Amino acid sequence: MNKPTPAIVSQDAARRLPRWALLLFCLAYAVPGLVGRAPWKSADLASFGYMLEMARGQTSWMDPRLLGLRPEADGLLPYWLGAAAIRLGDGWLAPAMAARLPFFVLLGLAMAATWYAVYLLARKPQAQPVAFAFGGEARPSDYARAIADGGLLALIACLGLAQLAHEITTSVAQLAFTALAFYGAAGIGRRRWWPEIGLLLGLAGLALSGAPTISAFLGAGAAVLHVLATARPWRKGDWRVLGIIALATLLAILLSSSMDLWRWRILLPQDAGSKDWRTILRLLVWFTWPAWPLVMWSLWRWRLQVWSRTPSLHVALPLWFMLVTLVAALTTKPADRALLLALPAMATVAAFALPTLTRSVAALIDWFTLLFFTGCGAIIWIIWIAMQTGYPRQGASNVQRQAPDFVASFSLPVFLVALVATLVWGWLVHWRVGRHRAAIWKSMVLPAGGAALCWLLLMSLWMPLLDYVRSYSVVVRNVMAIAHPAQCIQQWGLSREQVAAFAYHGGYRISQATPDQLECPWLVVNPEALAGLQVQASAGQWQLLATLRRPSDKGDDVMLLRRTSP
């Protein structure tokens, strides 16, 4: 028996967002940040370093190393994808751009899988809106498309998605495969086999991307929920569903075991202080904004469908995916990369809040979003004008303080792109304040549009500045001005990303210095490891030529030393 539904939706409110507009919207969000920039500190650059070494044949594809160091993130599949793209693009595409192409596809896969997952869940009988006495309620397919549009917009609106989803790390692969597994679990049992294939690839890909435990828990929980959500769980068709989910989960577990992917990374509660918990709480608030208030609202309005003997899958399934990834974020580090995996499920739960919102709540969302993103966009423009003209003086001085040697440049195409994006935002605001728009996804238009606008402005107007302060190109150029890349050079205590930066930006083949092998005339040293070097080698053998500092980061110095005696 279906529980009373809180959704009251007319056919007029179930209008769908035009496909071309939704596609352009996704492209406007996904493309900026993937093109026109150097690899950034730290995980983005470190991952690229391993991919570059693999593509050049400098390390094994089954056990990649960077000067003897294994990757911090487990899972080989993302590195394989990036390295294969670099090798295929050799000669006609820059390595950094080639490595980003598979991750651009993965981001698009995450968006598409989220849309289809929401659509399939919204088609379920328990998710349908109230039937009107004299007709006029939304048709099931139109209602599901409108909810799916809202879910995708809610995903894009999440503030934490922007930077991490545009990197070339295992986190992006985990996000895509989590969304793919979510789609498979949402649609399994239909006549077509696409959801089953999606579930199998999603759980296996998630395990191969370094999250085998999450993969196992998601698969097991999906199987249990499908049993609990069925009034007669032991029919032939339900046995088939349970068997497919169990098989996909078992294959992911066996794959993880065969490749030795299981790692214990859990931080027990006594390992984290009160300050860490406060930090995590702040991360949850801003990272998942604006989805989390809608999630709370949705869980309250749909509580009868969740807390019952036969829970409704359209809320219970995304809730399980959300809880598993939230627990992973609370018990592992870095928390933000684990929290990224919760966003597709949170966006789904938030989407089911849209048909239950009152006018006052919808208006509050619109006005807060309008003020917040308009203010953010204005600040980005003001700082850019200050970089170009020196006025306002306060903005120019702030930039000069953070990047003392940065010289701004003007690009007409970049300016026009940013200007068009700002004008589109103005049109979007004008459209939204119109009283004639009744679509249920309308409350997500401004949050998603504002997030896309600010990200696009940052990745266009501020790109030269961000490249200057977030990449190691400046440090490498300063070293190249003293030590030519063709000369023998060793390193002592550098991080993975620093080694990768010297290999990519300078073409250096830096070797690892050891106490009994300090034969090169040049030595690049991490200042924190200098004391250890002085213990192993005579201080009089080396002359400090320069201490090179990465802009905006005083704790990321590099020291260049030259041998003075054999």
Over which residues does each language-model region extend?
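Membrane-embedded architecture of ER/inner-membrane glycosylation machinery
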Residues: K3-L23, S171, G187-P566
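Aromatic-rich transmembrane-lumenal/periplasmic boundary elements in polytopic membrane proteins
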Residues: L27-W61, W262-D271
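Extracytosolic helix-loop segments that constitute the early lumenal/periplasmic catalytic or substrate-binding loops
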Residues: S47-A73, L77, A84-R87
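Loop-to-helix entry region of an early transmembrane alpha helix in multi-pass inner-membrane enzymes
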Residues: L76, W80, G89-A117, S141-D149, ...
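Transmembrane-helix motifs of polytopic, lipid-linked glycan transferases
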Residues: L101-R139, I156-A157, L180
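Hydrophobic/aromatic residues in alpha-helical transmembrane segments
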Residues: T114-A117, L161, A181, V295, ...
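Short acidic/glycine- and proline-prone juxtamembrane loop motifs at membrane-interface regions
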Residues: G160-A173, P212-I214
